[in-house]
Design a protein with these regions (language model features):
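Gly/Pro/Ser/Thr-rich low-complexity, intrinsically disordered segments predominantly at protein N-termini
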Residues: 1-178
Length: 178
C-alpha cells in the first residue's frame, strides 16, 4: 500500500500559512490561552501546553549561548512557515542577512540558519524527523537543525545527516547543564 499526499505549490502554501497565522494572532480568545500554537498545512490550530521548567531553562540557555558566541538574532518559540503549516521552533539563530529576507510580518518564510528543538517526554522520534525535514526544506532551508535531549545532550544535523559538532557554531557545548 502506498500513500501519496498532494501538497499545494510552495508559494500557495506560504500565502495560505501567512493568512492562517494572521487569523490566529488576531483571535482575542486564543490570546488568553497559555501555551504554544502551530498550524498544520490545512490551517488547523495545534496547541501544546506551556513548556516545563527544564524545557524553558534549556531554551533560554541555548539562546543565550548562541547570542554570546555568534551574535546575530536569536528568538524562541519562533513561527516558521513550512509545507506543513506554521511551526513554532523552540530556538532559532539568524544572521542579519538571512533575517532581512526571511521575515514577512510576524512569520519567517525562510528557515533560519540554525533551528533548535528542545525535546519533551511527549516528542516521538518520527515527529522530530518530520520537523527536521520541514526545517531543512523551508524557504532557503536551515543550514543546521539541533536537538537538545531531555538530559541536555546536544545532537547536531546538517542537510546531509548527523554531524559531531555544529559547523556554524563549533564552540557550542555538547551539553546544556542547568
Amino acid at each position: 500500500v502506498s500513500l501519496a499526499i498532494q501538497l499545494p505549490p510552495r508559494d500557495d502554501q506560504q500565502e495560505f500559512n501567512l493568512r492562517a497565522w494572521e487569523r490566529l494572532l488576531a483571535d482575542a480568545d486564543l490570546a488568553k490561552i497559555p501555551g504554544s500554537f502551530e498550524t498544520d498545512r490545512h490551517g488547523h490550530i495545534i496547541m501544546t501546553p506551556p513548556p516545563g521548567y527544564q524545557h524553558g531553562g534549556r531554551q533560554f540557555e541555548i539562546g543565550y549561548l548562541l547570542r554570546k558566541i555568534l551574535g546575530g538574532n536569536v528568538r524562541t518559540e519562533c513561527p516558521l512557515s513550512t509545507l506543513d503549516g506554521v511551526k513554532a521552533v523552540d530556538v532559532v539563530w539568524l544572521s542579519d542577512f538571512r533575517e532581512s529576507s526571511a521575515l514577512k510580518g510576524n512569520v519567517l518564510i525562510q528557515a533560519p540558519e540554525i533551528c533548535v528543538e528542545v525535546l519533551s517526554p511527549t516528542n516521538t522520534p518520527a515527529e522530530m524527523e518530520e520537523k527536521k525535514s520541514l526545517y531543512f526544506d523551508a524557504g532557503a532551508g536551515a543550514d543546521e537543525v539541533w536537538f537538545c535531549e531531555e538530559n541536555g545532550t546536544m545532537r547536531f544535523h546538517s542537510p546531509s545527516g548527523p554531524i559531531q559538532t555544529s559547523q556554524l557554531c563549533p564552540d557550542f557545548p555538547p551539553s546544556i547543564d542547568l
